[in-house]
Each structure stands twice: as structure tokens, then as C-alpha cells.
Amino acid sequence: MSSSPLSKKRRVSGPDPKPGSNCSPAQSVLPQVPSAPTNGMAKNGSEADIDEGLYSRQLYVLGHEAMKRLQTSSVLVSGLRGLGVEIAKNIILGGVKAVTLHDQGTAQWADLSSQFYLREEDIGKNRAEVSQPRLAELNSYVPVTAYTGPLVEDFLSGFQVVVLTNSPLEDQLRVGEFCHSRGIKLVVADTRGLFGQLFCDFGEEMILTDSNGEQPLSTMVSMVTKDNPGVVTCLDEARHGFESGDFVSFSEVQGMTELNGNQPIEIKVLGPYTFSICDTSNFSDYIRGGIVSQVKVPKKISFKSLSASLAEPDFVMTDFAKFSRPAQLHIGFQALHKFCAQHSRPPRPRNEEDAAELVTLARAVNSKASSAVQQDSLDEDLIRNLAFVAAGDLAPINAFIGGLAAQEVMKACSGKFMPIMQWLYFDALECLPEDKESLTEDKCLPRQNRYDGQVAVFGSDLQEKLGRQKYFLVGAGAIGCELLKNFAMIGLGCGENGEIIVTDMDTIEKSNLNRQFLFRPWDVTKLKSDTAAAAVHQMNPHIRVTSHQNRVGPDTERIYDDDFFQTLDGVANALDNVDARMYMDRRCVYYRKPLLESGTLGTKGNVQVVIPFLTESYSSSQDPPEKSIPICTLKNFPNAIEHTLQWARDEFEGLFKQPAENVNQYLTDPKFVERTLRLAGTQPLEVLEAVQRSLVLQLPQSWADCVTWACHHWHTQYSNNIRQLLHNFPPDQLTSSGAPFWSGPKRCPHPLTFDVSNPLHLDYVMAAANLFAQTYGLAGSQDRAAVATLLQSVQVPEFTPKSGVKIHVSDQELQSANASVDDSRLEELKATLPSPDKLPGFKMYPIDFEKDDDSNFHMDFIVAASNLRAENYDIPPADRHKSKLIAGKIIPAIATTTAAVVGLVCLELYKVVQGHRHLDSYKNGFLNLALPFFGFSEPLAAPRHQYYNQEWTLWDRFEVQGLQPNGEEMTLKQFLDYFKTEHKLEITMLSQGVSMLYSFFMPAAKLKERLDQPMTEIVSRVSKRKLGRHVRALVLELCCNDESGEDVEVPYVRYTIR
């Protein structure tokens, strides 16, 4: 899953401002965003009171200001069954000020179905008191206390947010009225078997600072008309992305300068590149340029109290295929509360008498309901299903509703993201058996064991089947931890012959602790898979988890081989990159195993289920590739901070990693030069010049030499190169058409003058000199004063721009220039490189970029290098936090989204284990908790293809036994003849991986040689690799013609050799 990274948002405080649509000068309507600190090393551009090491990934979702507001909010969570503990876990990880756990009940067997911090020895103990020490471990910044008294008003008044879970309606109404009258924000959450309910009341005057959390859009202006209203046209490089009603501000407009620095202006979108603003008819004429930026304007939203909203509800849809269901469930849940009040228990599982009574109660509730709620026709089957499962308690439903509820708590605390207005209902009845008659009351009776809450919904047969499952979990990060927790709760792999195999090669880092909730501070540096397996064993001692530390890929196919996959019942991906996802998808298609796929990005998440012979696979559809930045934009014409940050990352690699690697290869590999000369274009020249610089021209002998190098490099990049660029293209340069060269996306730069008293200049030298020293194994220094003193004695050669230097304006120009290479310069370089014999024992130390260690100078270099270049081009700088997001390609993450997404994954798991065969039983899902938005759809069926009268999908293949009855292996000729006689197909090309084994245009001599060779011998010869003993079959790809000579698309071949 890919999307634009989210950025830090500004905080807006005070009353709700009223930005105008008139174009009058700004009157400080919105607070100004503080400029990025100039001294990245001194202040790191970070907030002193937020632990950025811990909250790093969450800060990219919420921003610093929302995070600060979160840290001033005390939250009460009432009810510590499975739903309550899920909400408490997520908000404690999120970092609120304090959490109080309230429960007057004791742990029962049924609670263990989903309450992951209760153990069998806790039966009979107070749920809040038992859970408190285990929840408190999650985040040392959040005090967690337990309270077992009544919810009296004096007690409630000490909280900013109150969360009620699994509570009687009578209590909800009483607490709701009190909270609404006192401005205390209220979240009510409830789960009943396969059903969930959520309600929010954040008061009558809540200030919403940012409704969607997306990075404010910004684009370049190409024209503004003098009109009423004025029409703005943007450069046609990309659509502006604005919506009508958005507010924007302008900067750098030439001519119509009245727009610059204006208060936010409301716009109306006219097209993908145009929108109208205010009356510009009296403004100056527009000349050129300008940047228009979206402004997040705070707005006031109002909530009804619980009692008022009960009578006049507003619903957030979770599934548009169930459009009428929220209103039906609104009646059903009220009837359920009446049933529980009358009987002091929920309806018995699958009990017809109780179901009939609930239907009667629902009719009564409906008949007395207000006109806004009353249903013309009550869905009595739905009400009966509610009765049948209401006694159940399912970990996946609690994970989903708990993730949503915890996100609502964070919205209540921070004013960030649009809250649920005000009711949300959810059901997953598709999880029930497709054979509706297979469940009976007897099968759903409690067994006095930890799975009673689940048996109440699905019966004992599924419980036994879950226990026998053998699943492969790939990844033990955020999604992996949540999956393991859910697996433990539902009993997956907990029975005889059951097993979960989890693999992850990573170790635990501090930034993981904020959302990978199975890990603790004392686990940092330990292996994720081992630690997660041990932690989940505490939650359910019956779970059988085997932990591995292997990366999945061709290199580990000897471990995850045919025998391994054939014993599996399914695979769950918990990966963070597309390549690994696609690899596992291919493996699952090949071995015909179900795959549960999911991913998150900030508040966004997605779930996909892949079922053999039924659905398409993960790789059947792909996101469009991310747009890359043109090389010439990076090298000479940046116009956004993203460009300067990517340039700084390239600088890091080109200064501190690649030259050191090339030098080490040159000194140890006699064929290095020969191999380098075979590279394309100007690469041989660039590589050998870098080796020469590292070993001859720039070889430092001391720390002072490193400081000198850093100072010279500063001048090269931020003064000399810019002066050369301006020599080639002066500020007043015109294009061949007479237009200014420096216009549109090309920003005219200016050279910088080195100033040792400028903290940013000294930051750069400190970081660059230390990293340069590190590559040579020299000791560095953190003494800024000493470095400043050294810099005063550095002699910087005078620079004069040269004539005849070619600077490429486009990537096409660059490519054509790179096609030729100066052979005489190459020969000269080869002659001047020192012989490896003369440098015995010398080696360099390449540096791998590590963004999360603030002491290693890596981010110090990136921030300084990027912001200096930004200053060259008058681009607003970025602080360390934003720089780390972009340069480090960080994926924003928050525990709430992960919990909700994994809840949905495990609902699909129920269906997979039961063997559902109807496509409409399964649900692919997408959610965005910030909006909030939920979208569910049936998976797409596997696309069908045909040759002759034979239909096939990606799940089909030709099965060919390579070993014949006489014990000899099939030759290429026999293979070709087999397809001609058995399938009436003439093979025109045959390949294995990237190796071409046969083609119709192959030279006659080579073809004659191969025809009588065994297939595996040809594969080994062409690929130059011996087949491992673990390889039992080869995947062969075919191009074929039918009998009429037409190309036909056919499946691949599984060619069995053992």
C-alpha cells in the first residue's frame, strides 16, 4: 500500500476563526508556523517534552501539537473485558496523560476469549486490578491506575474523556447526561458476538483543527485573471488536488502582489488545473510565478447528548452493501439492553425462545421510537442473529471496534481528525457457517474453558478446527504482533498438530515500542520473532509458536520448501514492503494456499483475502508506481524541500558509502577495473574518479584534514556550483521562445557565503567531517568550538566560473550526453590509480544510512545539506522531524489503525478456516480512521483465460512428470512433443526464471545440442547454477501457438523432478 507521507500539522488555538473570501490583508487570522530551527544539531528541530525516539512514527500521523494535547488528557476506561482492554492498550500506547481502569466485575472463563491480559489463574479476580500492572508496562510515560468503586459524579469530573464499554443503557444515559453537561467527552463502545456499536459525544463546541490529517497541498501558479471572481490556473505538471470550500494562501506571486501574504481565501474548483478565488479586478496585473498552498482552517462541530442522539441518530456507514442495517441495529441494541436488564444475562446462544423474545422487544422499541428512528419494516432475521450471538465475545471484533474507539478518544483529546458523528454499527455475519443449519444450541454451550466466548458464536466444531491449523506468519512487527495476539485469543494453532511459524529477521528498536505492543523497553536489541512468540505464550499457554529469523525470498527456499508449504493451512503476511508481499503471493499461488494480506499507512489500512481457485491474487492488481523526481531537477533545478532532501540523501550515498565500497573492491578484487569498464555510459568514469579521489586527491591524514575537506566541499556545493550554474544561465536568461528561463518550476538560485558563526554552516562541517573521518577509520570530534577554530585557518581556493561547461536542462539531454565516454580520460585514470600492492592492509569503512540514531551524524548531515541547498533556491527549510520522514522514507504508523486492520484480517480468517466457498462471503476492506471512512467489497474473482475450449485461471497449471516410468528424465525434445500430442500446443519459447531454454529462433547448432539433453541439465547449464536437493519441481513459462498458428496464452508448467 502506498500513499503520500503525512506531515506535521500546525496547532490552531483560540476561538473559531472566520477566514474571509475577500482578498484583504491578513490580520493574523491563523498562528504562524514556527520556522525550522537553523541548528539541527543543537535543537534537532524537535519538541523537548515529547520522546521522539518512542513516538516517532505516531508523530508523523498526529503532529507535535496534537500529541501535546494528548499528553494533557486523562482518560477513564470503564469495563475491562476484551473490548475495554483493547481500547486501554491503544490509548496507553498513544501517550495520553493518564488512564484509569474501572471494573467492578471479576474475571470469568468467557472473558479469556478476548481479554489478553487475563490468565487462567485470574478467574474470580477483579478484571481492572489484574489488568493494571500488565497495561502499565506498555508505556512508562502514562500512569495507569485501577478503580473498583461506583461511577459517581465527583469521580467522573476528574477526566477529560470517559469511555464506557459493555455497559447497561441505563448507566450510559446517566453518565452521558453528566458528561454532556460538564463538557467531558464521551465514547460508548459495545461488542456483542459478531456485532459492534460505537457512539461519540464530544460536546456542543468542539474545535476541529484538521479534518483529514493529509499534508496541505501546494502547487505552482501559471496565471491569475483580473476578474470577479479571479480565476487561478496552475502549472499543468500535476492536478492541483483542491476541493471547493478549501482555503488557500499565496506567496511569490509577481505582479499581482496583493495576493501575497493574504489571509486564507476560500476557493471554488473549476477544473483539475483551475479554481476561482475572490474579486481581483482592482488588483495589479499578474506577471508570473507564485505558489498557492492549502491552509487548514479550524472549524467548530457540535454533538448531541446520548439521550438526544438516541432519538435522532446520525450514522457513519461501515458497509454500503448493508445500507439499512445501522438503523435496524439501533433498534436491536436498545431491545438487547432491555432483554439484559430483565434477565440479568444476554440471550442464550442459538436459543430460539430467547431470540423470539428479543424480536418481540425490538418490535416494542420500534413502535415507540421517534419518527427519525422508527423502521417501516423490522429486519427480524437480523434481530434473531443478534440474539443468537449476543453472548459471544470475539477478539477480532473487539480489535476492530477497540481500534476505532481508541482513535475516537485521541480525536476527543487532540481535535485532530473528523470524529464519528455520532453512531457507528458494524456486523460480520458473513463469518457464520455458509450452511446456516450446522450450528445448534448444544454446540454453542459453554465448556468452562478460555474459548467459551467464541464457542457461543461458532460452536465447538470450529474451535477444534482452529486448534489444528498450521499457519505461516511472515513478519513480527506491528501487524505481526496484533495477529499473534488474535491467534492466541481465538485458539489458532493451539491444539494437537496445530502450529504458528513466525519469521522476522529484525531486532527490536525503541521506535517499535509505540505500536508493536508485545515488546517492552528491556526487549530492545532482541529478536522480534523470539520475543513476540514468548510474549504471546503468556497470553495463551496453549499456543504453539515456532520462531524463525529468516528473510523470505529465493535465498531461503531450501528452508521454506515444498515439504514446508504442503503442511500449511494458510499464510498471513505482516510485511512492510511490496517486493516481499509479491514474493509470498507467488509462493501461495504456486502452493495453492490461502493468503491473508494487510497493510497500514498512518490512519489508512487495507485488508485483502486471497483464496485458491476463487479470488484474484495480491499481484493481480498493483498500485501505480511512485512518481520519481527527474535527475536534472535534483541536480540543478529543485523547487520543493522534497527535492533538496533527496539530493542530500544522494550526497550521503555518494560521499560516505559508494566511494568506500568501490575502494575496497578495487583493493581486493583484481578484476574490479575490468568489470567497471564494462558498465554503461559514464559510469566507468564516475566510479574510477571516485576511487582516485578517495585514494589520492582527498586522502586525509588527520582530523584537521577532514575538517578542511568538509569546508572545501561546502564551498563546492553551495557556492561554486551555483555560481557556475548562474554563469551558464544568468538570472535574466531567456529561452528560445523569449520566455524567462528562470520561471515556472525553475527557481533562480543564489550562492551562499560561508560563515563559521552561522549554526547551519557549522552543523554541515561538523557532520560531514565526522562522517568523512569515519569512512577512513579516523577519530572525529564533537567539539564545535575547536572545529570553528580549525576552520579559520582553512584556505579556500578562489573560484572562477568556467566557459564551455555543459549543464543539462532535461533528463533527455543528460541521457544522450551520458551515452558517450572520454576514453583518453579513462586511460589516464587507470594509469594514475595507485597499485593495490602499495596499500597493504588499507581499507575504508562504508556507512549505511541509519535515520533513527541521533548520535551518528547521519540526520545531522541530511538536515544541514538539504536546508543549505533550500537556502540556495529560496525554498522554505524543513525541521529535523519532517526531514527524517522524507529522507528516511518513514511509514507513519499508529497502534489504532493496526488493531482495527488486524481485527478485520482475523474475521476473514474465520471464513478461511471454515472453508467458505462463496465469493460474496469474503470481504476486502479499506479504512481511513481520520475521515472516518470504511469501504468493503467482495474480492475480485480470478480472471479467466481460455485456449481451445479449456478455461484456466492463475491457480491452474500444467503438471508434467519429468521422471519417466523407466527412471530417465524427459529431454527437451520429449517435452516439446508432449505438449504437441497431449495439448495440441506448439511451444515457441520456453524459459525458467530469467533463463531462456528454447526458442524457435535459436541457432540450429545450439538447438540440435539441446534437444536430446535432459531438462534439468539444460536449466543448470543456462542458469549456471546447480539445482539444490530441496528443489522438487521447476516452474517453466511457455509461449505457444495453437494448431492454426495463432499465439495463445497458457498457464505455467510445474515440472516435477523428484
Curated annotation (Swiss-Prot):
Gene3D superfamilies: NAD(P)-binding Rossmann-like Domain (3.40.50.720), Ubiquitin-activating enzyme E1, FCCH domain (2.40.30.180), Ubiquitin-activating enzyme E1, inactive adenylation domain, subdomain 1 (3.50.50.80), Ubiquitin-activating enzyme E1, inactive adenylation domain, subdomain 2 (3.40.50.12550), Ubiquitin-activating enzyme E1, SCCH domain (1.10.10.2660), Ubiquitin-activating enzyme E1, UFD domain (3.10.290.60). It comes from Oryctolagus cuniculus. Disulfide bonds: none annotated. It is found in: Cytoplasm; Mitochondrion; Nucleus. The modification Phosphoserine is found at S4, S13, S21, S24, S46, S810, S816, S820, S835. InterPro entries: E1_4HB, E1_FCCH, E1_FCCH_sf, ThiF/MoeB/HesA, ThiF_NAD_FAD-bd, Ub-activating_enz_E1_C, Ub-E1_IAD_1, UBA_E1_C_sf. This is Ubiquitin-like modifier-activating enzyme 1. Pfam families: E1_4HB, E1_FCCH, E1_UFD, ThiF, UBA_E1_SCCH. There are two active sites within the E1 molecule, allowing it to accommodate two ubiquitin moieties at a time, with a new ubiquitin forming an adenylate intermediate as the previous one is transferred to the thiol site. Monomer. The keyword Ribosomal protein does not apply. The active site is at C632.
